[in-house]
Amino acid sequence: NRTQLHAAIEFACLDIIGKKLGVPVHALLGGKLRDRVAFASYLFYRYADPATGRGEVRTLEQLVAHARELKAKHGFTSHKLKGGVFPPAHELACYRAVAQAMPGEGMRYDPNGALSFDDAVHFGQAIEDLRNDYYEDPVFGIAPMRALRDFVRIPLATNTVVVNFEQLAANAATRAIDVVLLDTTFWGGIRPCIKAAGVCETLGMQVAVHSSGELGIQLATMLHLGAVLPNLGYAADAHYHHLVDDVIEGGPLRYEGGAIRVP
């Protein structure tokens, strides 16, 4: 959409200005507060590789093994399950199994608004005893999310119904969403995300950094955003650890202890 086109232009302009002045982008945005940005593992259900028959992630045991593999390789201490694939009862069992396998670590669940309202209530109440970072878009729309707030005692997050300032104002009035997931493309660039984070801090909402399926260039925008936000309270999302290569020079950026150094 048009906002995402603005983001691409902003990224390029910030890069040009930084190169001209000889400074990193985070210096143009107020200066970094952290050298590394922590990330959560992103757990997807998967088909098996048709060539090898390996890599399937469908069962509880397969998902736990996949989560352990990612933790061992990258050092993640927060874990996100992308749901909305199987019946809620199966995904609930999978989610609880990962939490049990990663004691004391953060958990988050995102079914992309696929749950019915009743299923969202049941799922949310069934995981209240876990260490949940947040419950992301279990139902779709500000009004349903606000209704869910009355039944679930977990922070509710979104990257779908609060992605511009008009929606942010509506959320300020309804208090449907606790955690606004800032996406550098959805919001039209890094600077709008910083402005939105300031509004959220003023109004008592929390923020995190969202992933929309990035390569290295957009990942760099996420890292510079994460570096400068004083009210960043959660590990960022990223699809990045699922990539086998990247378009940037030197290959993919590396995780160290579940985090990536700000370039």
Regions found by a protein language model. Give the residues of each.
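Shared catalytic-loop signature of beta/alpha-barrel
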Residues: Q125, R131, F140-A157, V162-R261
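Short low-complexity stretches enriched in small and charged residues
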Residues: H66, P111-G113, D133-P138, I217
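N-terminal capping/lid subdomain adjacent to the active-site entrance of alpha/beta enzymes
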Residues: N1-M107, N112-V121, Q125-D129, D246-P263
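A cross-family glycoside hydrolase active-site/sugar-binding cleft signature
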Residues: A40-Y42, K80-K82, R108-N112, E136-P138, ...
